[in-house]
Amino acid sequence: AAAGDVILEDVPGSVNLFNTLQDQITKVTAHVQDLTQKVRSSIYNTDKGLSFLELKDQLLLFYLQDLTHLMLEKTNGKSIKGNPGILRLVELRTVLEKMRPIDQKLKYQIDKLVKAAVTGSLGENDPLRFKPNPQNLMSKLSEPDERESDSGEEGAEGGVAKKPQSKVKRYIPPRLAPVHYDDTEAEREHRIVERAKKLALSSSTIRELKEQYSDAPEEIREGRAYHMMRHDKEEQHRINHEESMMVRLNMTRKEKARKKRVLSMTSQLNSLTHFSDISALTGGEGRAEDMVPFMKKSKKGPKKSKKKKGFSRRRH
């Protein structure tokens, strides 16, 4: 009796569901017939479609067919136990679930293609609108040469027949005239002051003040000078490069002089009372040339001609 009451309560809902289902089936059937007619009349071109969407449509169609078959069996009061349609539904559902991540990745491209097919143009904010124009990559060699045209006109005036111009022209590189760099005195002083500030920030005095007043943990180093540590680092890098590339690097005259100067600094005691110049950071006044040490001034003047002295013959 209780089971009969449950069935009677479900009857009105089932009837409404069947009526709604019948209306939906009628609309879907009309829509599918309309699309089929347009495809057969070549209104919609489906030759170059996406195989992924075609596979998805076929799987959904098979899924609906098996589901409809099982609903028909249950409506007729038959048992669906052991029905092969259940295994097919599980398999199709698994494949459709596995295809969902691929569908999400292709969603942007599919929407863009559909929008371009409907509107006939890309969107205003589409990144492909800002791609390079291939027409700008056309060779300029096919353009008429001005010099050849001028020479052709002069030949025509002189009575000489003008030769037909060939399509392939000779490439003429543009002529670039050297321009002198005008460096004012203010710009030169500003550049020297900036260099002095950079050297002052990397000096040992600023580094020691930073270590003294900084809250960071103190870094314990070997008791060696900073210039020696830098020299050892460069030398180790040089050795590693020579060993890895199996080649010997030749030192220039400038590098040899710098190495000799660095090695000689360790044996000199004259620099004990020499502190780094940080006047560029404190706003000290003075010439810009005095702020940057070790600046060699080039001497401009007439070069003396070197003439070999030979022995003069003495006549007897």
From Swiss-Prot:
Region Disordered: start-end pairs: 124-169, 292-316
GO cellular component: axon; chromosome, centromeric region; cytoplasm; dendrite; filopodium; nucleolus; small-subunit processome
Keyword presence, Membrane: no
Pfam families membership: Sas10_Utp3 (PF04000)
Family membership noted in the UniProt record: Belongs to the SAS10 family.
Function per UniProt: Part of the small subunit (SSU) processome, first precursor of the small eukaryotic ribosomal subunit. During the assembly of the SSU processome in the nucleolus, many ribosome biogenesis factors, an RNA chaperone and ribosomal proteins associate with the nascent pre-rRNA and work in concert to generate RNA folding, modifications, rearrangements and cleavage as well as targeted degradation of pre-ribosomal RNA by the RNA exosome. Its dissociation from the complex determines the transition from state pre-A1 to state pre-A1*. May inhibit mRNA translation.
Designated name of the protein: Neuroguidin-B
Organism: Xenopus laevis (African clawed frog)
Lineage of source species: Eukaryota, Metazoa, Chordata, Craniata, Vertebrata
